[in-house]
Amino acid sequence: HQTRNPVFWGGDIHSFWTTDLHADAGNPDSAVVATEFVGTSVTSGGPPFEAFNSILGLNPHVKFFDSRQRGYVAVDVSEQQMLTRFQVVSDVLDPAASVSTLKRFAVEAGKAGAVPV
C-alpha cells in the first residue's frame, strides 16, 4: 500500500510554514509527493520576518510563511480532506485575548499538496 498524500509536521522554528515537498527538490516542476506544515509557538518569538520573506522567491516550494504572529495549528480530518488552520492569538499577554484564523490549507484525500482555502 502506497500513501499518496503524506503530511509532515514540525514546529521548532517558531513560525508558520506550508511547504509542498517535490520528488526532486531542485526542480519545482517535479511531482509533489508530500506536504509539510510548521506551527509557531504561543509564547516564543520567531525568526526575523523580513530576512526570511526576502528569500522566499528562491524557494518556490514554500506556499506560506509568517513569523510575525503567535499562535497554534488546528487540524480537522475527514474522509475527503485534512483542513489545517493557522490560529493566531491577538495578545499573548492577555488571558482574554481573541483567537482568529490567519490562513487555511486543505490536503485532499489521495492527492499530495496543500491548497489554500
Locations of regions flagged by a protein language model:
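Long, structured stretches of catalytic cores involved in phosphate-ester chemistry, encompassing
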Residues: 1-117
